[in-house]
From Swiss-Prot:
Lineage, uppermost ranks: Bacteria, Bacillati, Actinomycetota, Actinomycetes, Mycobacteriales
Isoglutamyl lysine isopeptide (Lys-Gln) (interchain with Q-Cter in protein Pup) cross-link site: K157
Catalyzed reactions per annotation: holo-[ACP] + malonyl-CoA = malonyl-[ACP] + CoA
One GO MF term attached to the UniProt entry: [acyl-carrier-protein] S-malonyltransferase activity
Protein name as annotated: Malonyl CoA-acyl carrier protein transacylase
EC number: 2.3.1.39
Pathway listed: Lipid metabolism; fatty acid biosynthesis
Biological source species: Mycolicibacterium smegmatis (strain ATCC 700084 / mc(2)155) (Mycobacterium smegmatis)
CC terms in the record's Gene Ontology section: cytosol
Matching SUPFAM superfamilies: FabD/lysophospholipase-like, Probable ACP-binding domain of malonyl-CoA ACP transacylase
Length: 290
């Protein structure tokens, strides 16, 4: 995930500093660690934020600014988005992601829960089936793409008997993220968020809660913490982008690493909008022509 970025001037030192802040060896975890090591949510979350911010800082060095852009991040990616939009510092973003990951890992250990993607089917029927099984639509990513979360036994029943014209794919997550199962992680995460110095956004920052721009730094931080137990409404973020793009002279979508999933959604939901998935420094070339 991080190997190509560490070849950039200053990147290794930056990551070393973030490793100290997070209490994790992000350099090793992002280069030579096994897949099993980095699937631990306590590791994955700060690693994802670090990867995003390394790429963004390189883009900034090349003269690009987030000002006058729209910024959004999915789930833990929202923390990185807050740093890109100037609400928190990059250092605090990594620290906050590490706390979030550690607290959520503890919550996941309380009882066996998980997540599964429900692809296709009628939305109303899918939601009704989830409710009947006491599952939560934890991520509503796009039309025909809802992520269910809850007890493992209920997810097994969903997979055995999916909604009509839908298929279920279990996800390799540690637990039922963005549901009430994460409630025990709230206090520790909230305390960490309250200790962070904030500034007003320098770019339009969309919230996972409702897809709308945050009103202020205080509003942003309140929503960020609350999002731990609430569904990610990426579908609403996409709807806001669609509305904004209709009146824009030019528009394009850039997804920072680890990239690919959100660009894939954009290609389906925002047809005709140029996109770029940034996976290595070379992908930053030519963004002016996007």
């Amino acid at each position: 995930m991080l190997t190509p970025w560490l070849e950039l001037p200053g990147a290794a030192d930056r990551l070393a500093a973030w490793s100290q802040i997070s209490g994790l060896d992000l350099t090793t975890l992002g280069t030579t660690a096994t897949a099993e090591e980095i699937t631990d949510t306590a590791v994955t979350q700060p690693l994802v934020v670090a990867a995003t911010l390394l790429a963004h800082e390189e883009l900034t060095k090349r003269g690009h600014s987030a000002a006058e852009t729209i910024v959004a991040g999915h789930s833990v990616g929202e923390i990185a988005a807050y740093a890109i939009a100037g609400v928190i510092s990059a250092d605090d973003a990594v620290k906050l992601a590490a706390t979030r990951g550690a607290e959520m890992a503890k919550a996941c250990a309380v009882e066996p829960t998980g997540m599964a993607a429900v692809l296709g089917g009628d939305e109303a029927e899918v939601l009704a089936r989830l409710e009947a099984l006491d599952l939560v639509p934890a991520n509503r990513n796009a039309a025909g793409q809802i992520v269910a979360a809850g007890a493992v036994a209920a997810l097994d029943k969903l997979a055995e008997d999916p909604p009509a014209k839908a298929r279920v794919r279990k996800l390799a997550t540690a637990g039922a993220f963005h549901t009430h199962y994460m409630a025990s992680a709230l206090d520790g995460y909230a305390a960490a968020a309250q200790s962070v110095t904030t500034s007003e956004p320098t770019a339009t920052l969309l919230s996972n809660a409702d897809g709308q721009p945050v009103a202020s730094a205080a509003d942003a931080m309140e929503k960020l913490v609350a999002q731990l137990t609430k569904p990610v409404r990426w579908d609403l973020c996409t709807a806001t982008l669609r509305d904004r793009f209709q009146n824009a002279e030019s528009a394009g979508i850039v997804e920072f690493p680890p990239a690919g999933t959100l660009v894939g959604i954009a290609k389906r939901e925002l047809k005709g909008t140029p996109t770029r998935a940034i996976k290595s420094p070379e992908d930053l070339d030519g963004l002016d022509q996007l």
